[in-house]
From Swiss-Prot:
Its main location: secreted. GO terms for molecular function: cytokine activity. May have an important role in neuronal precursor development and maturation. Gene3D superfamilies: 1.20.1250.10. It comes from Pan troglodytes (Chimpanzee). Belongs to the IL-6 superfamily. Glycans are attached at N43. The keyword Signal applies. This is Cardiotrophin-2. One of its GO terms (biological process) is cell surface receptor signaling pathway via JAK-STAT.
Length: 203
């Protein structure tokens, strides 16, 4: 074997393999995620409205709103403009993936709660199940975007822990209100941020 050929073989062996993510354009998964988020956005108000309708007073009272109610296990979608504007793509994707992972788990919990509290409400249960599946789908799209950009995917975690159990009927109703409300808020935020990503990485 000649010296030059031996050198070429050695360089080939030492060269790191090309990342599969490097050959994937982020434009396609971003477009898919954006389309799904837009579709989800069309249904979030109906989900919240249907949910409140089945909970009884005061939640079902006209004009009910309780923005002060929050869940420590579910990150709020609101953020100061300066903080949001300073996020890079990786930071936003990480926050969004953690939020929609938490939402899928919380929506399953709310679905279980409503099966117990309102077993005769197939429309509500169907809407909750559909919202959970769409949140899972958007989470998968965001993972594909993250991979295409060569960024690490946040690890899955149990966001509910022990806090999900032992709540009263009214506490479970309020918890479901917060979850369905924040599902809408996070979907609105996803639409806005994915639109920016779509413009940035358009083919």
């Amino acid at each position: 074997m000649s010296c030059s050929l031996a050198r070429l073989c050695l360089l080939t062996l030492l060269s790191p393999p090309l990342s599969s993510a490097a050959s994937i354009s982020p434009a396609e998964p971003i477009s898919q995620a954006y389309s799904l988020a837009l579709y989800m956005q069309k249904n979030t108000s109906a989900l919240l409205r249907t949910y409140l309708q089945y909970q009884g007073s005061p939640l079902s009272d006209p004009g009910f709103s309780a923005p002060e109610l929050q869940l420590s296990s579910l990150p709020p979608a609101t953020a100061f403009f300066k903080t949001w504007h300073a996020l890079d793509d990786g930071e936003w994707l990480s926050l969004a993936q953690r939020a929609f992972l938490a939402l899928t788990q919380h929506l399953q919990l709310v679905e279980d709660d409503q099966s117990d509290l309102n077993p005769g409400s197939p429309i509500l249960l169907a809407q909750l199940g559909a919202a959970r599946l769409r949140a899972q789908g958007l989470l998968g799209n965001m993972a594909a975007i993250t991979t295409a950009l060569g960024l690490p995917i946040p690890p899955e975690e149990d966001t509910l822990g022990l806090a999900a159990f032992g709540a009263s009927a009214f506490e479970r109703k309020c918890r479901g209100y917060v979850v369905t409300r924040e599902y809408g808020h996070w979907t609105d935020r996803a639409v806005r941020d994915l639109a920016l990503l779509k413009a940035k990485y358009s083919a």
